[in-house]
Amino acid sequence: MAQQLPCVSSPRPLLAVPAGRWRAGVRGRPNVAGLGRGRLSLHAAAARPVAEAVQAEEDDDDDDEEVAEERFALGGACRVLAGMPAPLGATALRGGVNFAVYSSGASAASLCLFAPGDLKADRVTEEVPLDPLLNRTGNVWHVFIHGDQLHGMLYGYRFDGVFAPERGQYYDVSNVVVDPYAKAVVSRGEYGVPAPGGSCWPQMAGMIPLPYNKFDWQGDLPLGYHQKDLVIYEMHLRGFTKHNSSKTKHPGTYIGAVSKLDHLKELGVNCIELMPCHEFNELEYFSSSSKMNFWGYSTINFFSPMARYSSSGIRDSGCGAINEFKAFVREAHKRGIEVIMDVVFNHTAEGNEKGPILSFRGIDNSTYYMLAPKGEFYNYSGCGNTFNCNHPVVREFIVDCLRYWVTEMHVDGFRFDLASILTRGCSLWDPVNVYGSPMEGDMITTGTPLVAPPLIDMISNDPILGNVKLIAEAWDAGGLYQVGQFPHWNVWSEWNGKYRDTVRQFIKGTDGFAGAFAECLCGSPQLYQAGGRKPWHSINFVCAHDGFTLADLVTYNSKYNLSNGEDNRDGENHNLSWNCGEEGEFASLSVRRLRKRQMRNFFVCLMVSQGVPMFYMGDEYGHTKGGNNNTYCHDHYVNYFRWDKKEEQSSDLYRFCRLMTKFRKECESLGLEDFPTSERLKWHGHQPGKPDWSEASRFVAFTMKDETKGEIYVAFNTSHLPVVVGLPERSGFRWEPVVDTGKEAPYDFLTDGLPDRAVTVYQFSHFLNSNLYPMLSYSSIILVLRPDV
């Protein structure tokens, strides 16, 4: 038996969870790569003739000369001209539209035009064959359609060529595929509803652009925040307003989200990290169990905003989604909030060889995907295929896409899902070295991690992308873990998974983590300082869309994912959670109080750590998913922001989180540009100046000099015992409590406007006068230095 290649899909595998599987019972068009080639699945409408290239021969007395006959389309209303090979995609020019698409292996190609009604009826309005002599330059097919009748129409391509999966080729003239450079994609009209006839994969087509841009940016400019000043909020756009309690006019849409942006401003958030908003198919896994691809980590087209997040759906050929996304960004900027997009360039929705032919696979499979010599798909993504990111054509495509979202859509940065895949060597299908230098006969093995990946180099040094935020999820499903070691050119930040794990361990009282926890508070210098990076290259988080919510982290010791339909096999088993003594939501009063303290402790840690804090949508009010740590497939309340719950608890956890983000912004010392020095930061134990870094230590405290507050004292007691701590003496000053998670709200955060604040502080005077402070078990405190008057 042949040896199985690492992370290569087996001869006929199913897609790996959690991405779902290509099930035998999935409904949709039979344009599946694993099936044999079929007859044309779309037919041209009889009302309009197909324009064909005709070569006319004229006899002359001296010689024979071939003359290309002038061609027309759409009943003679449009002229068909040679066109230009650049730029790729559909480009509105004076008098018409230029179409250009890369395909290195196709022997024939045609442009398919759709009227919206014909697309819905699953038929091509008109097909324009491309002449390989006139309409091809190198590996780019191109054509210019002159005339106004294209406005409001849609387009796709047919490609013919070799269909040989064992050689990595899937050319099949029976499929109309979507242009990777399409700026909007139109398919089904309503979110979560199959097309007429029950199809979950109806024919898709790209929007033909208009020659003018009607969107009013109202003078919008980049906010240009320094990354050290960010407070990031990971948000799912549909989930943010889909719950009935949002009371928005257009729930689950870009416009609906705009109506709730003031909540984020009030919360102190100045950066949104949007979960995937590229065009994807939420019915990708649809079956009798009605599972959805809710999160959207399975892209169909990287240039197109998700059409079914638009309040207008597909009624305007996709223009509505573009303009509503722009409106969302513009209105966020007006409120001082940047927008970062979560982009999934590690794989696509086409899956493995049993997946559908939608776009990349039918255009040039061996260019766009990592393939083994016998055509198998490498599976470093865990989702059936791996995007061939460092191939010259693919990396050019990715950079073009990022530039578009920055220049046209005004986004402020990107978070790259499974970014370690972007560092792996590409498939080499020719004897030519695609890395541009002689290799003396040795080829880089497909998937090898590269020290200087060409794609990362291009992005890092691109003049247009130079000032945007770049965040890497520095690992992949193939076991490559690069946190602290991602190739960075001093511009890439990382989701700091080590911060998450260390903070979870220490806050729940695990021995042996005091020193590592202190490292996290300093911005993880052991990870980032030696490589020349700064604390703000660490994106600090405790919870994200993957895994438990903050409330579930302190409520469940085990995951409860049965509702996902995978027998609880999916999702992370290593959660480092602690239920505080009783499993589940319904617990005793003492356990519930402890859970409240723990949630606050985590949030205090996030806000006092050097680096960039990020928290997940709903954690500010204690959203629960019932212990499900992998809710990728649920389009209901478990993934919806509960505005009613936020209001119910506005005086409790939400108030605390809002005040903590405000406190962080007020303290210059909590967002330093460089790692704190010993002159500014001092460590303490139960007694000042005597930190305990022993294996059994569950107490960490520090003081930090601050330009606005003078000095702050922060302590974490994660022992099961209360403790009275000694405070550093400061002549002429006294310590005053601001935060104490051991106290019930509103005394957990003492504000100047609290009616009985003075009385509360006075109650501690007998301790404070002696430079002491009592701490409950599993609690954290913040004190500030005040003049002793």
Swiss-Prot record:
It catalyses: Hydrolysis of (1->6)-alpha-D-glucosidic branch linkages in glycogen, amylopectin and their beta-limit dextrins. SMART domains: Aamy. Its main location: plastid. Coiled coil: none annotated. Pfam families: Alpha-amylase (PF00128), CBM_48 (PF02922), ISOA1-3_C (PF21156). One of its GO terms (cellular component) is chloroplast isoamylase complex. SUPFAM superfamilies: (Trans)glycosidases, E set domains, Glycosyl hydrolase domain. Residues 1-44 form a transit peptide. Transmembrane segments: none annotated. The record marks 546 as: Transition state stabilizer. Pathway: Glycan biosynthesis; starch biosynthesis. Optimum temperature is 30 degrees Celsius. It is found in: Plastid, Chloroplast. It comes from the Eukaryota. PANTHER family: GLYCOGEN DEBRANCHING ENZYME. This is Isoamylase SU1, chloroplastic. It comes from Zea mays.
